[in-house]
Amino acid sequence: TPTTQNTLSLHDALPISDSSEDERRLGEQAVFPETVDVNIRQLDPIPAPRAFLREQPLTDEMSELVLHSRQEIRDVLNGRDDRLLVIVGPCSIHDPKAAHEYAEKLAAVKRELEDRLVIVMRVYFEKPRTTIGWKGLINDPDLDGRFNIRKGMWLARKVLTDVLSLGLPAATEWLDPITPQYICDAISWGAIGARNTESQVHRELASGLSMPVGFKNSTDGSIKAAADSCFAAGFEHHFLSINLDGRVISAETKGNPDCHLVLRGSSHGPNYDAESVRQALEDLKVSKASGPSQHGLVIDAAHGNCGKDENREAEVIEEIAERLAHCEQGITGVMMESFLVGGHQKPAPLDQLVYGQS
């Protein structure tokens, strides 16, 4: 009867089981139609996040460093700490040994300048591509096209624990929405790149992340999408994700009040000049007037702000420092790319690359 049908719950109406044994048995019995996985060559299982966290746990000291540095970054962004946030390190991590050597040197600089700077090491494992190319340590750790993602994820946690053991907080770019469950416990600052700043998936992701997140302006130079993302990520969202046991779940977030804008220039030129910063802050004020928070911004000295010429990054930083010395308001941090050897090289097997060069 209609009355009986109305009393059925969704769980009653759908063949859903919480039993892993039932799932296994149903999976063995399932016959998938020809409409499924047409373009999939292979499906390789990866251990759940909890397995990686259990095998490579953070020590109490590392966890305390992550929590403390996240709060330091929040205080800088909100003007409660007058130090400058500095996010610096390789374009992306491809050689854990070289990354460790670089981290040792940066840790010494951090200790020397910690009364003036909040230094965070750039530890990027995922590379967004305009078309195709090497997509980072997690995706292809051996740079040989074998895509050993299990090894890549293990190496990512190894690099992070090495960096934290030296007393350095870590920053990374969030690209794949599953990756955070594997490494976010070790991250103090996160970025959403220019190619993903309009993505609803990444706005939702940022709303649930436990650290401050910077949204970069679009590749065409527009800051509207990034400003909208900062606003949207400050509110609660509901979306599909996985938990630490690898089960698909519906995530409900509280919203991230610590999202902010990163100016990285564009194909049309730089946007770190005083007028661009003033206009960006004004646009943020308008777009976030009724939002959860209002922060200063971060200048990325690389990409469009240096014309993709790594030798100009230092010039950008020097100009920013001079303007801050003259009390320019609104700039709360800077980003720059740096490694043991200047310049960059094309991807190749590790033994064919220049050691310590991005």
Cite the ranges covered by each PLM segment:
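Short, small-residue-biased leader/transition segments that mark boundaries at the very start
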Residues: T1-L14
